[in-house]
Amino acid sequence: MLKNKKLEFWFVVGSQNLYGEEALNAVKKDSKEIVDSLNESGKLPYPIVFKTLATSADEIKNIVKEINYRDEVAGVITWMHTFSPAKMWIAGTKLLQKPLLHLATQFNENIPWKTIDMDYMNLHQSAHGDREYGFINARLNKNNKVVVGYWKDNQVQKEIAEWMQVAYGYVASENIKVARFGDNMRNVAVTEGDKVEAQIQFGWTVDYFAIGDLVAEMNKVSQKDIDATYEEFKDIYILDIGDNDPEFYENHVKEQIKIEIGLRNFLEAGNYTAFTTNFEDLYGMKQLPGLAVQRLNAEGYGFAGEGDWKTAALNRLFKIMTDNKKTGFMEDYTYELSAGNERILGAHMLEVDPTLAASKPRVVVKPLGIGDKEAPARLIFDGVVGDGVVVSMLDLGTHYRLLINEVKAVKPTEDAPNLPVAKLVWQPQPNFKDAVKAWIYAGGGHHTVATLELTVEQVYDWSRMVGLETIVIDHNTNLRDIIKETSR
């Protein structure tokens, strides 16, 4: 099981020496109280550490250098308790290489109208400091996040928590390594991409391996380990033998277990956290990896089919952000076009992620009419319901583009007893026709990552961190604006 590391966020408060020691001591006291309260709220996924009260350019530059080189620091949260002249922030901000959140808050929620004087105004002037600090971030074209509101407010704490998830993903993205078993599916366009640019812009390492490398690792797997894993299945899944001979069923499931163990060992040896397969590159294998892929998805590995390394890496990135909850590789497959009930059925040949399962999956062995191999085992289930996004990344030759579509995953209106794959059904926003048109006009791929744990804003925040052109298709979308934006 892939686990997220324990990282932290530093809290840096801006002021200046003009206000005197007494005022600065009050600023420190208030800052520590805010940090302690946020940490004790139970709302944040990672701890905040009050690091310093910055009153000079040298202090700011030095703390930024430390933020950059300390591996345990995922990002920085800044707050302007008072006015902090922004020229002091230029050198440090230019050096900053990690995510930045500007918390536009104030220590006191209410203005004390009956007692307010200039001493109070000088100490509590976040409105003044926010604008000076915001200007320099805009001038430096810093893709920072701004959260506004009272620091005890539930919504403010929720926004900080959601940004933390994204910031963690941004930092961890540098360690994403994708193993490609075989090349891209022949003649498919949208799964191609510039791997060098992806490593420069997103930090992703993408390596190719012949399928024989995986087969060699599979051949090292012991029958004892295969049998032990099969026994575990009896508690985890529904073993649905169907019309199969019991021995035939068990052997075909165990072949997927052999693939799973071999794959895991290969990935662990090379520190790979995502991978791709291709049904056209299966020499030496008895089955296309199906159940094996799904089992590794459940452990946090990113995946995409047909050699689509961009989607595999994006999948792993979102699994990091969501702690591997309700997130997986998806493919737009078929439409429901009945008036007023339009929706999209997403699935894949085999490899639908079980973190998206709404119920206990069934292990099924059915023939696969593609790849020319034995009938593979796979998990079958209906997908979860709720609000989420589907996200696609494409290479336009001159640059990468990200598409984010807000969706509502829904329960299928009928059973599909003859469909031998897991599925997720969703209604795209703002409505079916405009969403599909916008997706097609913008060049969106058929492969996506579907997640019910991230919001449009979170994915958009990440895209800003990496300087990625992004098209959002949601309840605010105007189709003409999308066409105009994508026709430049």
Curated annotation (Swiss-Prot):
InterPro entries according to UniProt: Ara_Isoase_C (IPR024664), AraA_central (IPR055390), AraA_N (IPR055389), AraA_N_sf (IPR038583), Fuc/Ara_isomerase_C (IPR004216), Fucose_isomerase_N/cen_sf (IPR009015), Lara_isomerase (IPR003762)
Pathway: Carbohydrate degradation; L-arabinose degradation via L-ribulose; D-xylulose 5-phosphate from L-arabinose (bacterial route): step 1/3
Role this protein plays: Catalyzes the conversion of L-arabinose to L-ribulose.
Cofactor field: Mn(2+)
Family the UniProt entry places it in: Belongs to the arabinose isomerase family.
SUPFAM superfamilies: FucI/AraA C-terminal domain-like, FucI/AraA N-terminal and middle domains
Protein name, entry field: L-arabinose isomerase 1
Binding site for Mn(2+): E306, E331, H348, H447
Annotated catalysed reactions: beta-L-arabinopyranose = L-ribulose
Origin organism lineage: Bacteria, Bacillati, Bacillota, Clostridia, Eubacteriales
Pfam family membership, one: AraA_central
GO cellular component: cytosol
Cofactor annotation remark: Binds 1 Mn(2+) ion per subunit.
EC number of the protein: 5.3.1.4
Entry-linked HAMAP family: Arabinose_Isome
Signal peptide location: none
Taxonomic source organism: Clostridium acetobutylicum (strain ATCC 824 / DSM 792 / JCM 1419 / IAM 19013 / LMG 5710 / NBRC 13948 / NRRL B-527 / VKM B-1787 / 2291 / W)
Enzyme class (EC, first level): isomerase
